Structures are given as C-alpha cells and as structure tokens.
A protein has these predicted regions:
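Short nucleic-acid-contacting surface segments enriched for D/E, G, S/T with interspersed K/R
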Residues: 528-548
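A contiguous loop/helix-start segment that scaffolds small-molecule binding in enzyme catalytic cores
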Residues: 231-240, 245, 448-534
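OB-fold and OB-like beta-barrel modules that bind single-stranded nucleic acids
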Residues: 420-421, 496-497, 542-555
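Residue-level recognition of well-ordered beta-strand positions that form the cores
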Residues: 266, 512-514, 548-550, 567
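OB-fold/S1-family single-stranded nucleic acid-binding modules
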Residues: 555-578
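Hydrophobic helix-and-loop "lid/oligomerization" segment in the mid-to-C-terminal part
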Residues: 2-123, 142-145, 192-441, 459-464, ...
Length: 579
C-alpha cells in the first residue's frame, strides 16, 4: 500500500489548520473559512449584464408578457429554477401562476428545447445552462423571443449573441465557483434591490444544495459562506420532507456530506431515470406554492384518499432510486460477462466494450462501481454508429497514483482519444476503433505492473497514548469538509493479535487497536478475505498492519468511542512481540 504525507505536521498548528493548509488554503484564510461571514460575498453588480437582465424580466412581468423557464436536468438545474420561481412567486404570485410556464427535459439533456416552448412565449429564462447556444438564441430572437441566461458553464463570449447572459465564467466576477443556483441567487439579490424587498436570502438552502451537488470548490470563501448560511436554515418543502424520511442518517446534521449522500442522489436519480411525470412531481414539490397541495394518494392501500404533494414526491424519489439500483444491478451482469469474454481483467486498466447501448444516465455510476470492485482504473465504452461511422464512447473513472496525477489529462496526452472531457478522475471519453486498439497496447506497455493507489494522508499516527483523543478531535470537524476541502485521511500503524480481529455481521471487518478504545472497521469484507487474514496469524504472534482511513465517532447506547472507517489496509509483516 502506497501513501504519502502531504505536509510534515507542525506542532504549533491545530489539526484543522494543518488539514486546511494541506488543501491549499492560505493561512490568513483559515479562520474565515471555518466561520465565514457576509463580508465574503461579492457585489452582484460585478456580474456583467445582471442589471439589464433584471430590468428585462421585470418589464416583461409588468407588461404581462408570457415567460418560459427552461429547467436544466440535474440537481443544480432544479434548485436554480425552483429558487427563481419561488422568489418571483413571493413578489408576483398571480404572474407566476398565470403568465410563467416552465419545461423539463424528458431525458438527461442540457440547454434549451425549442420544440417545447409555447407559441405565445415572449421571454425565455434559462437557469444553469445555454451560454453556448448562440444559434438557438438567434433563432428565438428572430421570432420575437428574448432570452435571459443565468449560467456558470464555460463558453466563449460571442458579440453577435442577442441573449442577455449573466455568467461568472464570462466576465471578471471574482468567484468562479458559483454554480447556476448561485448565479440565480445573485440575480434575485439585484431584484431585491430594485423592488426594495429582502426575499433572496430565504432561499439559501436551495443555493447550498445546488452548489454541493454540482461540486463547487468550497475553498472559494463566498461559496463556503453561502453554503454554510443555507444549511443553517433549511426551509424548502422537498428538502425538509426528504430529511424527515432520512432522519436516522442525517440526524438534523446538514453539511456537505449529508447533502451529497442523502439529498442530492435522490434528485439526480429522478433527473436521470425518472419518467416525465416523476420529474414534474419532484419539481413541483420544490415549489412552496405547490408542495403542500393535497393530491390523490398513490400509496399502496390508500386508494381514494389524499396526501400532500411533497410527501408523494419524496416517496416517489425513493422508488425511482430503488428502480435505478435494480437497473444498475441488471446492467452490471452484462458488464461482468463482457469482462470475462474480453479478458479485460488481464490488463491493469479495465477497458470494457459493450456492443449494446447502455442507459447513458448510468454509465458513470457503473464505471465507478466497477473501478471500486476491481481496484483498477475503468473505461466502459459502448459502440456508436452515426451514419456508418463507428466510435467507442462512454465513461472513465480513475484514482490518483504515483504515476498519474490526472487520468483525464493522461488519456488526452496519449494522443489516442477523440476527446476526454470532465474531471481529472471522472470524465467522458471517446475513441475511433483503430485508436482504441492502439490505446490498449499503449496502456498494457505503460502499466505492466498493477497500478497501486497512492493515498495522500494528512497525518501518520503511531502513538497509542494520544490516538483516541486525536481521532475524536478530528472527527468532530466533519462539518468543515466539502468539495476540494476533502475529509482528512489518516494513516495508522499498529500491531494486532488474533483476538483483536473479528468479522461482524453483513461483512464488516473490525480491528481493535490494543491498549486503546479505538476500533477500525471496513464494510463489505468477504469471508474468504477474512479467512486469509486469520491464517497469517498462525505464522507468528501478531501482524503489523498499516491502515488508511477516516476518523469517526461511534455512538452506541449513549456512549461515544473513537473509530476509523478503513479505506484500505495492508499487512506489513508478521511479528513476534510481547504486549
């Protein structure tokens, strides 16, 4: 097992200071990161075109023009549009209910769907998308329809574009880590100024959820501030109801971790795999003026009764998530067969080619699952035939190693792919058939040995005397971690006797560190793996084990004890020793 200490620990620093410095924060920003204030927020007027956009929208409302809002198909898109419509409903309830229509994508698609725009529309508003759709903007403009774009995606400035574009990537706005919902919030702040109201801050919960789901960099202090403020006061009916259903897991603790695991995935499941009816139900449940309406119950055994729309929505989201997991399981069987038939596992990078098309919405989830199961960088590619031109395209997932710091860039630099777009370790990729075969040969030559993960750890702990306190201390700061400020990873090295090791129910490995209250657990540990581990004890008096993992506080029957959630471990040597 390979690991690297990010920076030597300095005694003058607290563990939190050390971690935040390791994440690239300047020393003078650490206190501001931990407790951000409104001083971190930038003036919304720094966004180009924001006044023009606000006045254009208000003028359309005052003149009772028909307005269409295009909802983008991900969590950031849904929260962006929900924020805008909820805010406008506070100001102009009759206008929103009578003159503003909105549209959802039937499939996972981004940008304007011109065919869905009602014929009497005079203004189109697109939160979280469409900055690069110049031709659509021109087409609408020629038909007398103006566009307001409230977006954060990269696009080139085109002076011929008739749309009013508010985009932090296309101007000198200092914070590039605001997602679409952040831009909509800034837009509503300007509307507040014009209308002399103060409604925008009431929707910061949607801002927080959207930015967390869209993986915005929390090292940007404005982004951190808006997220912290939003999570302090959850008001949105859908988020509240979903939290109630997941209260055992969330435990009233709203932070980037709980939002990422127990809120955003349910929204994304519906946007990816839901029917149009399910998507409409979800979005309506995010609207304050729709969520608490009584609707005919769809609950089993409750025919003829009514229930709140938001309750129905949350239950439906759970059903869609379960359906998605079932579909994922069925598709995994196809992938396992392909791995066996193609002997893909013989290579140290899994390249899996599937003749039949998969649900594009599941590609990334499947690649991530296979990478985790096989412990190898993974590409899942499906055959595409466009007008007789064959390509292999799909999703790639990787992890940091000593040789490769960025898998997307590595594949791009190989010169064999048509494209590799996305994040360093999660991205879309495409090849021609000829170049794919060349890429396979290149990979096999480059990585003759198994590609070992290289864990970058914040601390190396070997002192039993301080271990319990160190773990409890670091675990108590869980609310501070987020995108680009990842949860600290620690490395422990201790010697274990056979009685310190146990396999609990449901495949949970438990290692109890002698002389401490600390236990280390790993989920999904197989009986065969456990048998092999136990046999090593027969060769000596104990095992010296290195463990890489995350700090946790185990709460049971009112008692709290330090715990390490194991990410990986290795037996360094068999030893003879005296406890």
């Amino acid at each position: 097992m390979n690991y690297t200490l990010i920076e030597p620990t300095q005694r003058a620093r607290s563990v939190v200071e050390q971690v935040l410095l390791n994440r690239g924060l300047d020393a003078d920003k650490i206190a501001r990161y931990i407790e951000p204030t409104e001083d971190e927020a930038f003036d919304p007027h720094l966004l180009d075109n924001i006044i023009h956009a606000a006045k254009t929208l208000l003028l359309a409302i005052m003149n009772q023009k028909k307005i269409y809002v295009q909802i983008d198909s991900d969590c950031d898109g849904y929260t962006s549009s929900a924020l805008l419509l909820n805010y406008l409903h506070r100001l102009f309830p009759s206008t929103v209910e009578n003159n503003i229509a909105y549209g959802l994508h039937s499939k996972k698609h981004h940008g304007i769907n011109i065919d869905d725009i009602p014929l009497d529309t005079q203004l189109v508003v697109v939160p979280d998308a469409s900055s690069n759709e110049v031709e659509f903007h021109k087409q609408l403009f020629e038909n007398g329809i103006m566009c307001i774009i409230l977006d954060h995606h990269h696009a080139e400035v085109d002076r011929t574009d008739p749309a009013i574009i508010v985009n932090n990537q296309m101007c000198s706005y200092p914070n590039k880590a605001l997602s679409g919902v952040g831009i909509v919030y800034k837009f509503c702040c300007v509307l507040d100024e014009i209308m002399r109201t103060s409604y925008a801050d009431g929707y910061l919960d949607l801002v927080a959820v959207g930015m967390i789901a869209d993986m915005m960099d929390m090292r940007e202090l404005e982004t951190r501030y808006l997220t912290v403020e939003g999570l302090k006061d959850i008001r949105n009916p859908f988020i509240l109801e979903l939290a109630k259903k997941n209260e055992y897991k969330i435990k009233d603790e709203f932070n980037p971790f709980t939002i990422s695991w127990y809120v955003a995935p349910f929204i994304n499941a519906v946007t990816r795999s839901g029917t149009m009816e399910e998507k409409q139900l979800l979005f309506k449940s995010m609207l304050e003026y729709e969520a608490y309406r009584l609707v005919p119950s769809t609950k089993r055994g409750c025919s003829g009764s009514e229930e709140l729309l938001v309750e129905q929505s949350v239950r439906t989201c759970g059903n869609v998530k379960s359906r998605q997991e079932k579909e994922k399981k069925n598709t995994l069987d196809i992938i396992y067969n392909a791995i066996q038939e193609q002997n893909s596992n013989a290579s140290n990078v899994l390249i899996i080619q599937l003749e039949q098309s998969l649900d594009n919405n599941l590609n990334g989830l499947l690649a991530n699952h296979i990478m985790g199961e096989f412990g190898k960088p993974t590409l899942i590619l499906t055959k595409r035939d466009k007008d007789g031109v064959i390509t292999w395209e799909g999703s790639a997932r990787g992890y940091q190693t000593k040789e490769v710091e960025d898998w997307r860039q590595f594949i791009m630099d190989s010169g064999y792919c048509m494209y590799a777009e996305g994040h360093p370790f999660a991205f879309g990729v495409g090849f021609t058939p000829e170049n794919l075969e060349d890429f396979k040969r290149y990979i096999n030559k480059r990585f003759e040995e198994k590609i070992e993960k290289n864990y970058k750890v914040d601390f190396i702990w070997t002192d039993k005397n301080t271990l319990d306190d160190d773990i409890i201390n670091l675990a108590s700061y869980r609310h501070l971690w987020g995108q680009e400020v990842g949860e600290p990873l620690v490395m422990l090295q201790f010697t274990f006797k056979e009685e310190n090791v146990a396999l609990l129910g449901k495949g949970t490995l438990k290692l109890s560190i002698p002389g401490t209250k600390t236990t280390c657990i790993q989920f999904g540990y197989g009986e065969e793996e456990y048998f092999n581990l136990r046999t090593l004890f027969a060769q000596g008096e104990g095992l010296n084990i290195q463990i890489v993992g995350y700090c946790r506080i185990n709460e049971w029957n009112g008692n709290c004890s330090p715990q390490i959630e194991i990410k990986d471990f290795s037996v360094e040597r068999i030893v003879g020793y005296d406890f």
